[in-house]
């Protein structure tokens, strides 16, 4: 085991000179509990956090195969799901949108007045702004404030020892800039990531397993788009054109990058396990970016007293990770790497005579801290076929935790079993 950890560390250090962030899958379950998941991985989330966790499917909660963890809710079938979701900082988005609309009306009125009076439009605009300082205050309040919006689609399959996924993650980050004379709308880094990945896990013992996976990733991005506020109505057409370019380019296979993921998992005691993973070890640049591998270590605690493996099953996990250890952008404050959280999942309606595998209604609540910022989430599963999920977390846009928070709200609908 020490040799495996040493191998993971040496691979990570050898690639620590890389700089950019890899395509990131946003797991609703993981993000809601602070993204501390490298040692939880008891279902399909092992595909994204630690392939070694695939060895736990149909083992946790299985008295015949692993009696020590028989108290844990069993996942006999694994997972096969289709997910679609979206996210954004909606509070700031709507506020900034209203400011932009107000400015559009103002500039259109100024343009009409300048034409009617035969005056210079810029001079009349400056006079108008000087007589309405509240508008300048509004502009300054949202000057270069990013408003990232995300969309995601996943197709996932996970069974004991094997898992794979095809997923797409897209993001656009519009902002309002005060400008030197005229404010304008900008879009910073419009991108679409497409990833196909799969891997397997092997349990050497009931307590120790390793996992390895491969992935192919494609990224298309547009760095900067600027739109004059006087032509604000054209932003929708412009973004649609950029989106069409991105979605067509995503199937250009010449620029696909291939990578590997590694993971280990060890059940230290009956209720306590530790895990480590080195993910996103790419062999070439991705859309011109050198990718920083993600080295994460963590633990998970599942107390027997709070877990219940019956028809009315209950799952309780507390987890803590030191995540993305090689990311130099987060090393100014070491605690920005610290993620921790807990989750409680309770079956509310069960089918008489059946165990947790066939349930009518299940509720999951989670909370935690990701890099110092609070996270939370809720999900409702109906007949094990339809799951509605919501999560919120924050990303740091500055150099250290607390400097510039970006609050994300994401919703998702999931179909499958």
Please give the residue ranges for each predicted region.
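Generic cytosolic/nucleocytoplasmic N-terminal low-complexity/intrinsically disordered segments
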Residues: 1-2, 214
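Hydrophobic h-region of N-terminal signal peptides that target proteins for export
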Residues: 10-18
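Subset of outer-membrane beta-barrel
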Residues: 20-417
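Sec-dependent signal peptide recognition
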Residues: 2-10
